[in-house]
């Protein structure tokens, strides 16, 4: 959802009084609650058609001028059919799937080879706008920053924060390798902080990382809320994570990211503002698992095979960390 926020800001700069309604999942609503000028309508995909009908009753009775249909999955396409709108703007044909074209009557320009955020940003172009600058300005309450500020004393030590898990298990790196990089950073005087959600996988992964480390680490996994997470990521100097939500939240908060990419292409879905400190094994993964170079794959192809993240060695992540440390001075 963080990729959509700059588009919201672009629309608001052009039309400050524009009423905006956003159909969103409950987690996204919790994260973005307080986003000025936006009315959220939470939809739980588990609610099926009943939830879609309930959403229709919740929406204004009059038809919208424009619907920006920024999801192509079949469920999202069907859901859009419950939203009355005169102009229904969707993705270009190359990005469409699951009957997307049946639910839209306009399309964004077809530009291959661009970041997901830029593709979303182009939804303003049929409206006569351009997303000339990318601004997030996520709504972070003062209380969230106070909580984050209380988690460790600011003694001048730089902070490497590790958010070890993605929503896709095959994008996740290995606990012993996280631990090795963390120990390397700790040996250079860095504070190590672990963050994450409350799932069993995140808990077991974190426990394994801490057990494998030779240096101490601050374990905050499962202790923050979605509203506190941006404030927590903001306190880090560098966040090490696979392709994940925290990667994009950290980037939105202005924190540099050491992204771990093999299953996905950082040029398409890496930290938008700066990929200099990412490990990029996407081409190696394409050659090993698909027998093709990354250039030969359809843009956006995922390489989510077992052990694809094995292509990223400890030395790769340490080298990325040292690139950041050198630039930081």
Where are these regions (language model features)?
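Catalytic machinery of carbohydrate-active enzymes
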Residues: 1-329
């Amino acid at each position: 959802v963080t990729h959509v926020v700059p588009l919201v800001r672009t629309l608001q700069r052009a039309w400050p009084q524009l009423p905006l309604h956003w159909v969103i999942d409950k987690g996204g609503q919790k994260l973005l609650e307080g986003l000025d000028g936006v009315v959220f309508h939470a939809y739980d995909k588990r609610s099926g058609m009943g939830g879609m009908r309930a959403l229709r009753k919740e929406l204004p009775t009059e038809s919208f001028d424009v619907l920006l249909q920024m999801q192509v999955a079949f469920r999202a396409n069907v859901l859009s059919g419950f939203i009355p709108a005169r102009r229904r703007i969707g993705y270009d044909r190359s990005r469409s799937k699951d009957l997307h074209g049946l639910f839209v009557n306009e399309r964004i320009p077809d530009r291959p080879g661009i970041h997901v955020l830029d593709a979303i940003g182009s939804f303003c172009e049929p409206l006569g706008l351009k997303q000339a600058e990318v601004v997030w300005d996520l709504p972070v309450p003062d209380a969230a920053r106070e909580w984050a500020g209380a988690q460790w004393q600011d003694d001048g030590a730089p902070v490497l924060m590790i958010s070890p898990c993605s929503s896709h298990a095959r994008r996740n790196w290995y606990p012993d390798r996280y631990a090795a990089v963390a120990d390397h950073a700790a040996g250079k005087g860095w504070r190590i902080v672990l963050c994450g959600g409350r799932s069993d996988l995140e808990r077991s992964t974190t426990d394994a990382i801490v057990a494998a480390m030779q240096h101490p680490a601050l374990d905050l996994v499962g202790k923050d809320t979605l509203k506190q997470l941006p404030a927590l990521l903001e306190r880090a100097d560098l966040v090490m994570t696979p392709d994940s939500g925290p990667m994009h939240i950290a980037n939105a908060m202005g924190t540099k990211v050491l992204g771990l990419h093999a299953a996905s292409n950082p040029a398409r879905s890496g930290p938008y503002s700066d990929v200099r400190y990412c490990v990029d094994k996407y081409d190696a993964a394409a050659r090993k698992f698909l027998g093709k170079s990354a250039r030969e794959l359809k843009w956006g192809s995922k390489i989510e095979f077992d052990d694809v993240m094995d292509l990223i060695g400890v030395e790769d992540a340490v080298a990325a960390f040292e690139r950041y440390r050198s630039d930081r001075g």
